[in-house]
Amino acid sequence: DLFDESAWRTLTESDYRISTASDRTGYKLEGPALGNSLGMLPSEAGCPGAIQIPGDGLPIALMADAPTVGGYPKIAVVSEADLPILAQRRPGEKIRFQLITIEQSQRALKRRASDIHTISQLASRSSRD
């Protein structure tokens, strides 16, 4: 594993503030550093939601315009269901990460899709009335 138990504990038990240096590429987070002694790694695939840890140890959550490859170690990925919620956060706002399983993430994504479908049907009925 690239990160020890201390890094995981820090990530999930700390508040992080979205930096003013954030944009659609990534949300730079201010808070406790996670300690990246690895520096750069060979380039590997990245995706929106990946949380990479550059040399300073401060997490960056990759967002919609994130590069498709990069060389920083990645500690986690924001659930696809939660990524739109994170995208609505503004610089200066606090966030906190919570570890969930892949199954929990999949259930949340299905709930979101169902909610969107329900809203779409209600809006469609409303426009016909």
Enumerate the language-model features and the residues they cover:
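Conserved "landmark" site that anchors the functional core of diverse proteins
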Residues: 1-129
